[in-house]
C-alpha cells in the first residue's frame, strides 16, 4: 500500500511524500510497519538547465517479527510436561538511504545538448556510493544520436572480496532514433552495457512510436 502526495511550490521548487506499508513474511511469522519517502527538487537557470535534488527513503520505526512461527514446544525435565514457549526476537531497522544529486545541461544549440550529472548515496547498511554520468545528444534532419556514460564508485570497489554490490563500476550506451512519415513516427535502437563482478551485462532494445 502506498499513499503519495506531490506539489509544485513554485516555478523552481517541487517536492513529494510517499507513505508506504512495509511487510515481510516468513512461514507463520510476519513483520509489518510503515515507512516514509520524501524528496525535493530545485531547478534554476535561464533555460532551467541547473537542477538539484535531495531525497530520503525508508524512514520509519524499527520492525520485529511476530506470529506462531516463533512458538516452540519444550519439555520440562522436572515434570515431563511439554510447555509452549515464545521465542524472543530482536527488532531491526529499515535500510534507510539519503540521496543528493545535481545536473547541468549544456544547450549548445537546438541540435546539440550535453547533460552532466552526479549524485551521492548514503546507505545505512551498505557502503556509500558516488555516481557520475554524462549524456550527449546530436540531432539531424534524418536521425538523432545519443551517447551515454557513467561510473558508480564505492569503497573497495576494485576488491572482489570486499565490494558490497554488483551494480558498480562503469556503464555506457547509445541510442539511434530515425523519424519517418509526417505524423511524428520514429524507430529507435538502444544499446547499454553495465560492468559487474559477474562479467557485465549487455542490453539491446528496439522501439517503434506511431504518431497520430
Model-identified regions with their sequence ranges:
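Outer-membrane beta-barrel porins/channels
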Residues: 1-212
Amino acid at each position: 500500500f502506498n499513499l503519495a502526495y506531490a506539489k509544485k511550490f513554485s516555478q523552481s521548487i517541487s517536492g513529494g511524500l510517499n507513505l508506504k506499508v512495509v511487510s515481510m513474511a516468513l512461514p507463520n511469522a510476519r513483520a509489518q510497519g510503515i515507512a516514509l519517502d520524501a524528496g525535493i527538487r530545485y531547478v534554476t537557470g535561464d533555460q532551467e538547465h541547473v537542477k538539484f535534488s535531495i531525497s530520503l527513503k525508508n524512514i520509519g520505526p524499527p520492525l520485529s517479527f511476530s506470529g506462531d512461527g516463533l512458538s516452540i514446544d519444550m519439555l520440562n525435565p522436572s515434570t515431563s510436561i511439554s510447555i509452549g514457549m515464545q521465542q524472543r526476537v530482536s527488532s531491526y531497522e529499515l535500510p534507510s538511504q539519503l540521496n543528493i544529486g545535481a545536473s547541468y545541461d549544456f544547450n549548445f544549440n537546438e541540435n546539440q545538448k550535453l547533460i552532466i550529472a552526479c549524485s551521492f548515496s548514503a546507505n545505512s547498511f551498505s557502503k556509500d556510493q558516488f555516481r557520475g554520468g554524462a549524456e550527449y545528444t546530436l540531432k539531424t534532419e534524418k536521425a538523432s544520436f545519443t551517447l551515454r556514460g557513467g561510473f558508480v564508485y564505492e569503497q573497495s570497489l576494485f576488491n572482489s572480496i570486499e565490494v558490497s554490490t554488483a551494480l558498480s563500476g562503469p556503464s555506457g550506451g547509445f541510442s539511434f532514433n530515425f523519424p519517418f512519415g509526417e505524423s511524428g513516427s520514429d524507430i529507435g535502437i538502444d544499446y547499454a552495457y553495465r560492468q559487474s563482478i559477474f562479467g557485465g551485462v549487455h542490453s539491446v532494445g528496439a522501439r517503434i512510436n506511431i504518431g497520430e
